[in-house]
């Protein structure tokens, strides 16, 4: 792989389409900026103009991170705000599933299964991006969700709703897409691994758990 030089980075961020795409995604979101290892910009911060992107690249910014939450004014948020106050200034949130696995093969497979579960639940507006190392970010925009759920505004159901959605998807994956066949764990009826192969990837750990169907408690077998 060719070395990622400063000139190559600047050439990339000079592109108008790249700048516009970043600014469009950053609209009404808090933007975190990292410079090098462990050096972060002030909070809260925003990106407003396309030229801001190139300016940050010139300042050696190494990564940009947008908030899941969407705000009326990102600069007005503070860690001192109560949940009620945050609800008043939050206009929505995007669902972000952060797949971070130490094994590249399993990371790709896990991402595939999450996307499959979303699609089988009628979700069509799905994004997926490589997030570095062996990880992926799966995104579903706030516009994909109903405005209210059981009389509660969806925008106010953060972070509870994303957590419940994640657990729901994990349950679908574990109960529908993973089976045991010929002493192997089979994912999506296609990808099979023996327990030893998984131990080689992840070390000694418990790969199979039996739970009671009614109470969901772990059972000894």
What is the meaning of each model-derived region?
Residues 79-87, 115-116, 123-131:
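Catalytic micro-motifs at enzyme active sites that drive phosphoryl/nucleotidyl and oxygen chemistry
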């Amino acid at each position: 792989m060719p070395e990622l030089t400063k000139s190559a980075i600047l050439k990339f961020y000079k592109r108008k389409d790249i700048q516009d795409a970043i600014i469009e995604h950053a609209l009404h979101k808090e933007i975190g900026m990292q410079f090098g290892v462990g050096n972060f910009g002030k909070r809260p911060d925003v990106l407003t103009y396309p030229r801001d992107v190139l300016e940050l690249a010139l300042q050696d910014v190494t990564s940009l991170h947008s908030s899941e939450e969407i705000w009326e004014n990102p600069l007005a948020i503070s860690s001192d705000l109560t949940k009620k106050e945050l609800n008043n200034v939050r206009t929505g949130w995007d669902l972000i599933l952060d797949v971070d696995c130490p094994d590249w093969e399993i990371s790709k497979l896990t991402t595939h299964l999450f996307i499959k579960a979303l699609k089988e639940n009628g979700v069509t507006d799905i994004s997926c991006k490589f997030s570095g190392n062996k990880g992926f970010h799966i995104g579903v925009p706030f516009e994909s969700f109903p405005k209210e759920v059981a009389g509660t505004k969806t925008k106010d159901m953060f972070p509870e709703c994303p957590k419940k959605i994640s657990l729901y998807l994990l349950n679908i994956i574990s109960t529908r897409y993973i089976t045991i066949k010929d002493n192997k764990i089979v994912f999506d009826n296609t990808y099979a691994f023996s327990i030893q192969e998984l131990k080689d990837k992840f070390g000694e750990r418990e790969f199979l758990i039996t739970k009671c169907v009614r109470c969901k408690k772990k059972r000894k077998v």
